Amino acid sequence: MRYMHYYTQKASVPEEQWAAFKSKLKLAFNNLPDSSTSAGGFYKDCPITLCYGPGKQGVRKADKLFVTGQGNDFTGEATWFNGDRLVGHEAQSFILPNVFDPENQKWMHCNTECKPYDWFVVTALILIHHEAPGCFEISSDGRREHWEPVIRWLAPVVGHELTLPQAVDGVGERYYPDSFENRLVGLPSFHF
C-alpha cells in the first residue's frame, strides 16, 4: 500500500531550532503510545516499534534516533529510523537531515505503507514544521483526520500549541496541550 509523506528541504535547520526539534522528538519517543491510530488506523492493534535506519535493530534510547553523515545519503545530522523488519512493519526509511544539500534530495519522501512507525514519522514532521518553519515544505497522501490522532497526543506531550502543515490541514487549526481545549477544536460556533 502506498502512503507517502513528502518533505522537500528548502534550507538548513538553524542549530538552535535543530536542538529544540531533537529535544522534543526525544521527549515524544519516551512517551510513545502503545499502538498507532494514524494513517487510517490499519495497524491499531500492533505495537509501535522503531528501528535504526533500515529497520534491523530496535531503538531503545532516544539518542539513537539521530545519526551523523551517512556518506551519499546526507551530510550533517539526521533522524533516521524505520519500522521493525522482524515483524514485517518496516517500509521506507525516514531520513530528515538538518543540513540542506541541493545535490542530494532523494530522501525527500517516505512511504510508510500505513505501518505503525507512521505515527513517529508524522510526529517528526509536525515537530520540524513547528520548530523550523520554512525549512521544509511538508505534504502527505494522508488527510487531516489521519494526522489528528498524532497531534492531539503530541501537544500535551510537548506542552504547547501545535499546528499541522498547511498542505495537510488547509485551515490552520490549532491543537493545544490541554485535552479539553482539543475537544473544542472544530466545533461549530453558536454565535449568530
Please give the residue ranges for each predicted region.
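Acidic (Asp/Glu-rich) sequence patches and key acidic residues
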Residues: M1-H191
